[in-house]
């Protein structure tokens, strides 16, 4: 239903940026997850990726093309000079852009409220994974236009925390 999914994203990359998307079979290259060849303007994605992972990688490529300069400026303007921190911050901001591109704030919040924050409906509507949707729900903290203050915690089967996120405190 929105530009942030599958074939629409591939079409967007082709029409707006001249980038062709090619799905790589395991027989062609079993090690590839994603790769962008700037010279040929081909973005390669593994056939082994789930549909939602492919979507996110496509949106991440859009983020890299459309927001890279702005993100670099944000990092520079905030004097982030650490060789360890700057790349992590850049990746986080690119991923945030990708999620926002797939699930635009106002549209996503309206849909979340309409469907009473039903994660499965939102997953279907935005062609995103459980983790992508729940992570985006934690981001809905725009002053004056907030969503429910969600907290995100990802653990492995043994209970080890591998990811935590909250913007609400």
Would you name each region that the model predicts?
Residues 2-169:
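Conserved binding/catalytic microenvironments
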